[in-house]
Amino acid sequence: MAINPSLLFLSLLFLFNGCLARQTFSSQQSQNECQINRLRASAPQTRIRSEAGTTEWWNPNCQQLRCAGVSVMRQTIEPNGLVLPSFTNAPQLLYIVQGRGIQGIVMPGCAETFQDSQQWQHQSRGRFQDQHQKVRRFRQGDIIALPQGVVHWSYNDGNERVVTINLLDTGNSANQLDNIPRRFHLAGNPEEEQRQLRRLAQQMQGRSERGEESEEEEGEGEEEEEEDNPSRRSRHQEEEEQGRESSSCNNLLCAFDRNFLAQAFNVDHDIIRKIQRVRGNRGTIIRVRDRLQVVTPPRMEEEEREERQQEQRYRHTRGGSQDNGLEETFCSMRIKENLADPERADIFNPQAGRISTLNRFNLPILQRLELSAERGVLYNRAGLIPQWNVNAHKILYMLRGCARVQVVNHNGDAVFDDNVEQGQLLTVPQNFAFMKQAGNEGAEWISFFTNSEATNTPMAGSVSFMRALPEEVVAASYQVSREDARRIKFNNKNTFFFTPSQSERRADA
């Protein structure tokens, strides 16, 4: 039977319209979910204890993080603690809040350029030489850029705790899974962390709290039934042993068949059995029995070299020459920069504070990650001029002190007007106007942006939108005199700050 072309066209058109309508509805539903009418400063919701540290997660299901497409965690590493190798499904920025240590990042396809010199000397006597990819030192104030799917580990070789704040950009185009944060562990027993993240994932998928509890109870019942079933216990000894070991081991290597792994690594089955055996609930941060001995550059030598390189970079940038990133190969690209040094500040006011920015121009890898950051300091009662982020969401973490923050949406409603305390997190959506003023003890913060070249538009000051408007437009828009319009435009000579003396004079007037 011949098919009528008109009928076929109408059928295809109907199907296309149906698909388009479904996509449009889904898009509208997603947009409606992100009609933010209220923001909150929040602390971590979950806390997972490991042998030598803790991992804390903010709830990625909360509206402000979900709509920004990010997840945030905080890690505390005790002295001599080792964060076991893992990778994530999304690029991340890691800020060192306190402490110092070493970190290794495994770039796929890159050579092992670090070699043990002592073993090199004894190689002629038959001793094997160890070699591995580059190990970097980190210290307080460093920001480290980690691409998605790249293995990383870290070790606290200092005498104080290391604290990091990690932003995972789950909404990034590089993440082709979903917006649930996923850490793929290659060692250790991340069972508790996985359980907590599964619970948060269930919330993100719209399951009720009662449904989560019933599913957990069912899961526990199945485990008990499996243990009590005699037919299961009668299995062959090796399978039974492997099953018992894997039940307390949740990293990627545990689930693979032992024979396959033995062939893949070209080692004996006993070695694979040791790899897959996890004794005790040590978690994902373990305590090393003896000091970890790996090849690293001397601490002061590397830090001094980094400072010299940064100084040369800034000198060239200020002279009009900007790094284009082409001279950096994938294997040798810089992934770290320190923002804590006051001399590193890009914006500075001796009465108000300073801001240091990090973007794709001074750390080219950020162009790949589509992220950027800033570290800010406000002195006693000083403030940041009202402004908005043109092209990015802003995720602010208070490092020290506190600040009053106001955020205003497109309806002119204040969706946040409160203090952000030390250790709290606040998301400022794209285009929402905001301002902040430090408390009596000042304030320090780190902000992450979901764009590699985040741009702000100040509402007052020397580079503001108000300064760029004609005087007549200001007078007509706000129904003020020409003299008042002139004062609004030109009275604040600062670029991004206002000082406490200015605000006090306005209040007294």
Swiss-Prot record:
<comment type="function">
    <text>This is a seed storage protein.</text>
</comment>
<dbReference type="InterPro" id="IPR050253">
    <property type="entry name" value="Seed_Storage-Functional"/>
</dbReference>
<dbReference type="InterPro" id="IPR011051">
    <property type="entry name" value="RmlC_Cupin_sf"/>
</dbReference>
<feature type="disulfide bond" description="Interchain (between acidic and basic chains)">
    <location>
        <begin position="110"/>
        <end position="331"/>
    </location>
</feature>
<keyword id="KW-0732">Signal</keyword>
<keyword id="KW-0708">Seed storage protein</keyword>
<feature type="region of interest" description="Disordered">
    <location>
        <begin position="187"/>
        <end position="248"/>
    </location>
</feature>
<dbReference type="InterPro" id="IPR014710">
    <property type="entry name" value="RmlC-like_jellyroll"/>
</dbReference>
<feature type="domain" description="Cupin type-1 1">
    <location>
        <begin position="39"/>
        <end position="273"/>
    </location>
</feature>
<feature type="signal peptide">
    <location>
        <begin position="1"/>
        <end position="21"/>
    </location>
</feature>
<comment type="subunit">
    <text>Hexamer; each subunit is composed of an acidic and a basic chain derived from a single precursor and linked by a disulfide bond.</text>
</comment>
<dbReference type="InterPro" id="IPR022379">
    <property type="entry name" value="11S_seedstore_CS"/>
</dbReference>
<feature type="compositionally biased region" description="Basic and acidic residues">
    <location>
        <begin position="299"/>
        <end position="314"/>
    </location>
</feature>
<feature type="compositionally biased region" description="Acidic residues">
    <location>
        <begin position="212"/>
        <end position="228"/>
    </location>
</feature>
<protein>
    <recommendedName>
        <fullName>Legumin A</fullName>
    </recommendedName>
</protein>
<dbReference type="Pfam" id="PF00190">
    <property type="entry name" value="Cupin_1"/>
</dbReference>
<dbReference type="InterPro" id="IPR006045">
    <property type="entry name" value="Cupin_1"/>
</dbReference>
<keyword id="KW-1015">Disulfide bond</keyword>
<dbReference type="GO" id="GO:0045735">
    <property type="term" value="F:nutrient reservoir activity"/>
</dbReference>
<feature type="disulfide bond">
    <location>
        <begin position="34"/>
        <end position="67"/>
    </location>
</feature>
<feature type="region of interest" description="Disordered">
    <location>
        <begin position="298"/>
        <end position="325"/>
    </location>
</feature>
<dbReference type="GO" id="GO:0010431">
    <property type="term" value="P:seed maturation"/>
</dbReference>
<keyword id="KW-0758">Storage protein</keyword>
<comment type="similarity">
    <text>Belongs to the 11S seed storage protein (globulins) family.</text>
</comment>
<feature type="domain" description="Cupin type-1 2">
    <location>
        <begin position="337"/>
        <end position="486"/>
    </location>
</feature>
<dbReference type="InterPro" id="IPR006044">
    <property type="entry name" value="11S_seedstore_pln"/>
</dbReference>
